[in-house]
């Protein structure tokens, strides 16, 4: 490199340089340069120098002076590190050609501890202003197609097709690159719409999936609601029919009671009338007796007077009395005959009625006997029912006890798991997160997943310490799976946690490991058990611990072992066991690798830390045997339901039989009452007849007496006629009255007897009616209680106080009308038996629905409504998004098509040059636009380079895994050359692109480059080129426009003065066969 005397020097023909070309480059304390100046030519500048001479420093200085970033150089990203070693300040200065304004001088000054400073034409400026200046001249230092630093050559050849397209656009057309950027922004907007559409589709799918999952629960819930609604409707109808039934029964019993009361009152009235009539007759008898006594006294007085006056009156009186007596006897005899005849007729009538009643009582005794046996049977059945109720209550108590026990065990198990989980959280947050996720997604796993901390149950007091000194810390949170699929599921790449997992399949579980017992010889030495015996765990987990920690081969001993530790160690050495534990010591025997002897190590046991809590001694899961509690509870519940239903049906059947029996009893009782009535009537009439028959009226004796009296009276009358004629009439009258009174008294007495007999008959009848009335009252009370219970049930079920519409309130009328309409619409049975069967059937269907396992609720119903509403809203939103997406895609597709046409035109021009260059090498190559599957994915468009360096082979895509480094360098260089005609940049820099090329290809590429720059047309004839290389081939076609710059590194300034650069170059060119 020639050194200039002045940093202000410019090339002699600098005015001919195209705008943006570099006229001068000055380095001061920059990288390898202390101070130097470099004047490039306007065409090809080949900068040659051995490795480490400072060739790449020129590229770095040009890039930084043009406002570039250190990141684009592939070296240090700290700009202060570009200062020469040992210095605190340095600068780079470049002069840019400009025919109108003159050379534009840009200086970048770098100082340690300060920000870099830029100056333009000796005036302070900013990096952004320098970037604007760079854009003005179209200097593309950030485009590897125009500016390819040494450390970026490899990355350029390895860049993707997408990156190659972007860089090609930057080099060929800023407008095309900006259009690509704008399209990518539009694509991001459309992608956002597509993401929203995808999100909406996923949301719709999620909503539909959730609706699909919840629909069976809602349908089952609706089915149960329908069944419950129908069951309630049937039960309402049953309550109404029961109320109507009991109301009818009550009215019938009330009518029977009224009939019994009427008959009872009539009999009471008859008795009162009889008593009143008897009293009146007795008063009449008393009155008649008083009159008779008075008349008799009067007659006696007259008789006394007659006697005093003469015997005639006495005779007359005697005749009169005899005559009256005769007449009275005749009348009484006539009446007696009539009464006897009447009594006989009444007796015949009573006998006929009694016989009819007797006939109706056929079977009464059998009924009574059957009734007694049935009552005994019903009593026995009721006693059995009460015993069954007691048994059911006992079973219910047992079931509640089991439920309480199960609930307590579940609570204890839950608390145990929570305590263990807290220990796990303190141990490892990732393991706790993974375990919680496993618990929440357990249904996705093929088998169970176990963990020592969560699933081990300690059995002995020393178990915690034994495990602390036997199980590794890493293994304590190990997830032990039964299937490989479960391990991939819990420890897949989709999770953020880092956990330890292992798989122990069922076929790898060996009972001789997990069930190993302490050998008798070790027991004699004082060992208590193997460590694997001090805890319980699921078989896969226990097998895992036996595999990794050898717990089935570690015996645990007490203080006896510690006392004779040497003897025990010697005995252990003879067995297959190498490790044993005591409460305070851990011993291990191992074979020496260098001598055939046993090495023994002892260490103090660590205190229990992980398993020190008491809850590790309790199983976190209910015992297997206790799992039967749920089955027993379900069994007891089913048995209670069945036995309760059977008891209800049994009692219902007995009650129905009792109701039928009571109705039959009432019929028989009515018949019995009729029989009793006529039996009493017959007895009364027969008593009357007997009394009448006992009353004998002897008329003949009275007639004879009368004749004697008459004879005597005639005889005496003749003697006393004159003396007694005056009083005779008076006496006769009085005796007539006396006879009347006596006859009246006799008749009254007879009537009193009759009245007494009738009263007794009525009293007997009243007693019978009283029992009937009492029975009717009991039945009425029973019917009333049934009616009240039915009314209460009616009010509770139907909100109705009565079924009489005239007595209903408007609200009740509305309810009743609604119920009637619902009954008609639901075709509810009107027969109680049919209705009862329907209720039983609906209860069975409801029970089946409740036991189906798909138990829904109002929460699911509400959730379904929310999901349906969300689904409608989401579908509406999706339709709008799809419309927007279609509109945006149409617009974007048109703009992409327009951009694509320009890009394809550009690539076709590149391809023409690229094919031509490869033909000159005797190889094949082509460039094409790589179009993504979705033409709208503008960010996925790229440039695909296909090459073939050997005959007979097909072209393959340029790739760092297929072609060699030299082949990639050739393909990359030719692509850059093919791109030059489309890239109007003022200068280009390529650093060591020929590294890895074979000499033949390197020579051909160089010839192509020289041929292109020797032309007089096209952009290359006006482009400045910097090509850096550590070597130069012999026999290259060097033209006049090729500027060779040699870079040498010197140790001191004086050494440089003695270095004859021109002579060195001439000698080198002569050796290479190049004319200078």
From Swiss-Prot:
GO CC, alphabetical: condensed nuclear chromosome; nucleus; Smc5-Smc6 complex
GO MF: ATP binding; single-stranded DNA binding
Keywords per UniProt: ATP-binding, Chromosome, Coiled coil, DNA damage, DNA recombination, DNA repair, DNA replication, Meiosis, Nucleotide-binding, Nucleus
Annotated localization: Nucleus; Chromosome
Reported effect, residue 965 to R: In sbj2; hypersensitive to UVB irradiation
Annotated InterPro entries: P-loop_NTPase, RecF/RecN/SMC_N
Region (Flexible hinge) residue spans: 416-617
Domain notes: The flexible hinge domain, which separates the large intramolecular coiled coil regions, allows the heterotypic interaction with the corresponding domain of smc-6, forming a V-shaped heterodimer.
Compositional bias (Basic and acidic residues): 375-410
Complexes and interactors: Interacts with smc-6.
Gene Ontology biological process terms in this record: DNA replication; double-strand break repair via homologous recombination; meiotic DNA double-strand break processing involved in reciprocal meiotic recombination
Family (UniProt): Belongs to the SMC family. SMC5 subfamily.
Keyword DNA damage: yes
Coiled-coil region list: 190-415, 627-713, 749-786
Result of knocking out the encoding gene: Reduced fecundity and transgenerational sterility. Increased apoptosis in germ cells and hypersensitivity to ultraviolet and ionizing radiation and hydroxyurea-induced replication stress. Increased rad-51 foci in the mitotic and meiotic germline. Chromosome fragmentation defects and unresolved diakinesis chromosomes in meiotic oocytes. Increased accumulation of homologous recombination intermediates during meiosis. Impaired DNA replication in germ cells. Accumulation of brd-1 and rmh-1 on chromosomes in mitotic germ cells.
Cysteine disulfide links: none
This protein's name: Structural maintenance of chromosomes protein 5
Organism: Caenorhabditis elegans
Entry-linked Pfam families: SMC_N
Region ranges (Disordered): 375-420
SUPFAM superfamilies: P-loop containing nucleoside triphosphate hydrolases
Residues noted as binding ATP in the record, renumbered to the chain: 49-56
Keyword Transit peptide: no
Functional note: Core component of the smc-5/smc-6 complex. Functions in DNA double strand break repair by promoting sister-chromatid homologous recombination during meiosis. Acts in a DNA repair pathway for removal of ionizing radiation- and ultraviolet (UV) radiation-induced DNA lesions that is distinct from classical nucleotide excision repair and the translesion synthesis pathway. Also involved in the recovery of stalled replication forks.
Tissue: Expressed in the germline (at protein level).
